[in-house]
From Swiss-Prot:
The gene is E6. Plays a major role in the induction and maintenance of cellular transformation. Acts mainly as an oncoprotein by stimulating the destruction of many host cell key regulatory proteins. E6 associates with host UBE3A/E6-AP ubiquitin-protein ligase, and inactivates tumor suppressors TP53 and TP73 by targeting them to the 26S proteasome for degradation. In turn, DNA damage and chromosomal instabilities increase and lead to cell proliferation and cancer development. GO terms for molecular function: DNA binding; PDZ domain binding; zinc ion binding. The keyword Metal-binding applies. One of its GO terms (biological process) is symbiont-mediated suppression of host cytoplasmic pattern recognition receptor signaling pathway via inhibition of IRF3 activity. Belongs to the high risk human alphapapillomavirus family. The cancer-causing human papillomavirus E6 protein has a unique carboxy terminal PDZ domain containing substrate. Belongs to the papillomaviridae E6 protein family. A motif (PDZ-binding domain) lies at residues 149-151. It is found in: Host cytoplasm; Host nucleus. GO terms for cellular component: host cell cytoplasm; host cell nucleus. This is Protein E6. Coiled coil: none annotated. InterPro entries: E6 (IPR001334), E6_sf (IPR038575). It comes from Human papillomavirus 69. The lineage of its organism: Viruses, Monodnaviria, Shotokuvirae, Cossaviricota, Papovaviricetes.
Length: 151
């Protein structure tokens, strides 16, 4: 499909432009399970702003099930450390808003509100495979004591 690695599209949107195909009708396989991505998986891959990988000059994405599954495996294998928000801001001397932090479960980039929520709730950011991770609003679970009911 794309012989020269420098000309290869890196995102789903760039691939759609290169193939002159709308996002709804794009046919891409999952790099892990090799199934053709359904439209919801294509949209999820685009929203997560993940990069396309190439195998034998063919473009591959990842379905949501595989993203969640392999994110957990990477978390177990490549976890480095956990820090609070103030410590993370002091390390690279940049504000949290300027750092790319993804959800460690679904890989969506966190917005400023989600990063601030982690700081306010006194939760930690995790360094996994050299990247900083947190939890997005969709994957957030309240702490156990917040969900317990009194009798």
């Amino acid at each position: 499909m794309f012989q020269d690695p420098r000309e290869r599209p890196r995102t789903i949107h760039e691939l759609c432009e290169a193939l002159n195909t709308p996002l709804q009708s794009l046919q891409v396989q999952c790099v892990y399970c090799k199934k053709t991505l359904e439209w919801a998986d294509v949209y999820n891959f685009a929203i997560c702003d993940l990069r396309i990988v190439y195998r034998n000059d063919s473009a591959y994405g990842a379905c949501k099930k595989c993203i969640i599954f392999y994110s957990k495996i990477i978390e177990y294998r490549r976890y480095t450390s956990s820090v609070y928000g103030a410590t993370l801001e002091a390390r690279p001397k940049r504000s949290l808003c300027n750092l790319l932090i993804r959800c460690h479960r679904c890989q969506i980039p966190l917005g400023p509100e989600e990063k601030q929520r982690i700081v306010d709730e006194k939760r930690r950011f995790h360094e996994i495979a050299g990247y900083w991770k947190g939890l997005c609003t969709n994957c957030w679970r309240p702490r156990r004591e917040a969900t317990e009911t009194q009798v």
